[in-house]
Each structure stands twice: as C-alpha cells, then as structure tokens.
C-alpha cells in the first residue's frame, strides 16, 4: 500500500448505500472488471468514465450503509479508487474494505470535488492544500498491517508463512 495516498477528490454526501455503490443487478457476476465499470452507478452513471485510477472518495456520514455485500468495496477498488475518506462508515463496509485491501479513514475533511489531497494513513491525517491538515481516526496497527499486505487473505498467508 502506498502511503501517503495522493489523489483527486470525488465528493459524496451522507448515507451512501451499497446499492448505490454497486446496483444489485450486477451482483451475479464474479468478473471484477464488471464491478469496477459500474461503481457508483446508482448515484452517477458516468462516474467510472470520469474517475481515474488513484482518485479518492471523500464522503459524509455512514458511507457504505445498507446490505453487507462485499461487492461494494470491490467495485470501488476495481474502478481504481485508491482510498475513501468519510466522516463515518457503516461498520460492515469498513471491515469489508479492510479485508480486500481498500484503504479508508474516518475524518471530517473540508475540500472540493477535484481537489488533490494527500491521505496519510500512518499519521491519521489528510492534507488539503490551502486548507490545512485535517486529523482523522488513525487505524490501529493491525489494520494497517492488513492493508499493507493487500487484504486479509494475503495478510493471513504472510503471517502463516512467518510462523513455519
């Protein structure tokens, strides 16, 4: 995992649910590219045509609410989103994102869509040029380890290999 993560901002509001992140009609596939090309389609059907790899989502409260579908963070990851910063996350979305290696941070950040920001997960900070540094909730070391290893499965394989 790169740190800090630098990218262009896409802004979303409160209560962005998993049905908006990846509509249910795409859930029968296992093709990650299909998930990636339909990310955020429930809010902005053109999102994946505009978003670029390395971009960052900044959102309000309760991001990822709704169903517990793991496909929601997978869709964002495979669309090229590098990180999500939100005031708060639905807990199951938060853990699903960590499990698949999608970095996120809880922070209340003042920025505009299109701004380039820098997210430092190790410090728990978001730098918005000309607006300053916004403190967020630093992830515990064990979650940072999972993200650094690329997700929970890769992390468990690494840990298991270290204990042989």
From Swiss-Prot:
Assigned EC number: 4.2.1.114
InterPro entries to which the protein is assigned, alphabetical: Aconitase/3IPM_dehydase_swvl (IPR015928), AconitaseA/IPMdHydase_ssu_swvl (IPR000573), IPMI_Swivel (IPR033940), LeuD (IPR050075), LeuD_type2/HacB/DmdB (IPR011827)
Pathway: Organic acid metabolism; 2-oxosuberate biosynthesis
Reaction catalysis annotation: (2R)-homocitrate = (2R,3S)-homoisocitrate; (2R)-homocitrate = cis-homoaconitate + H2O; (2R,3S)-homoisocitrate = cis-homoaconitate + H2O; cis-(homo)2aconitate + H2O = (2R,3S)-iso(homo)2citrate
Gene3D superfamilies named among the record's database cross-references: Aconitase, domain 4
Pfam family of the protein (one): Aconitase_C
Protein task: Component of a hydro-lyase with broad substrate specificity for cis-unsaturated tricarboxylic acids. Catalyzes both the reversible dehydration of (R)-homocitrate ((R)-2-hydroxybutane-1,2,4-tricarboxylate) to produce cis-homoaconitate ((Z)-but-1-ene-1,2,4-tricarboxylate), and its hydration to homoisocitrate ((1R,2S)-1-hydroxybutane-1,2,4-tricarboxylate). Is also able to hydrate the analogous longer chain substrates cis-homo(2)-aconitate, cis-homo(3)-aconitate. These reactions are part of the biosynthesis pathway of coenzyme B.
Entry similarity comment: Belongs to the LeuD family. LeuD type 2 subfamily.
Oligomer and partners: Heterotetramer of 2 HacA and 2 HacB proteins. Cannot form a complex with LeuC.
Name assigned to this protein: Methanogen homoaconitase small subunit 2
Organism, scientific name: Methanosarcina acetivorans (strain ATCC 35395 / DSM 2834 / JCM 12185 / C2A)
